[in-house]
Amino acid sequence: MKRNNGLRMLAAQIASFLKNNTTKRLTLALVVAVTFLAMTASASAESLKAFATRAGNETGTNTHFLVDLDNSSHTSLAFSTSTTNSLIKITYNAECGVLGPPESWLSVTILVDGVQANPASGAFFGFCTSLPNGVDYQWTGATRQSLIRVPNIGAHFVQVLVDINYGATNWWLGDSSIVVEQQ
């Protein structure tokens, strides 16, 4: 009888061990699966809608103009949306320099279908600024990222409006790229 009780106790311990380990394994597998799903569900995946690059430099003294977005002198970039109220992210970057008195600057404004994207700061978004001496460029690799909700499905276009401000006399924009993404 003593031996049977010992075997029963051993069998109960083995069953308990297997049950606990199975529960732990199932719990771990469930935690891993939920974590993976949470990571993929909460990731902010954007899809590339359009892009353009321009190699080389543009320089001038003009203001309030649309900058070339590629080497073919296109000042707009087309993209399309397939859902209403699409959240669009535009990233524009270029090497930038400006001449003028202290505190003068070059600004870029991102337009989608002629509407200013956010932050809608007009000519007050300083893309690059002048040096205090007014005769040397302060070269800057600058980036402007903007967001806008596009209400309609279909074809759209993005443009970059450039202004020189506060007495700036000359601007320079080097190699550039623009990327349009949709969330």
Q: Residues of each region from the PLM?
A:
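Bacterial N-terminal signal peptides
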Residues: A29-A38
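Extracellular jelly-roll beta-sandwich "head" domains, especially the C-terminal globular C1q domain
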Residues: N20, A41-Q183
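Small/flexible residues
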Residues: N4-N5, L10, L26-T27, G56, ...
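N-terminal secretory signal peptides that target proteins for export/translocation
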Residues: M1-T23
